[in-house]
Amino acid sequence: SECLSLADYVSPEGSTIGLFTLKVEDSRPHCDCQDFQHLLRESLCARLTEALAEWMQEQVCEGLHVIRPAFGYSACPDHSLKKDVFDILDAPEKIGVTLTSSYAIRPTTSLCGMILAHPQARYFSIGQVGNDQMTDYCKRRNINREEGKRLLGF
């Protein structure tokens, strides 16, 4: 089996990595209700956010083969990386998105991820993380092992 990393799609000579945070939000006041109209609006906003991400990718990466992994998913399971992106992009101030203590994005109809351009780029799951890999990751992120396991979902 292959052992892939998103770093495989970044050239040692230098590459550009795109970072993004997007949202589409219903302008009506938020409610915790579960009525059909509210759920329908939330669902529509989530689909429009995905469409916005597709449009952004086409505008930015015309003619390039790219992937758009989101933080917290199989190729990059550490949700805490969203905080770094929010800080770099000043996302809370610019578009009004926030993170919960568990790194969920508010509003929930938002996305945060990266764009990587590489001819062989593809989506994958990191799979099992070895002890040496966990140690290295925790050292690079300046976190303890327990925090690393929690952030990576192990």
Residue ranges and their predicted role:
Residues 1-132, 140-143, 151:
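Small-residue-enriched alpha-helical segments and adjacent helix-cap loops
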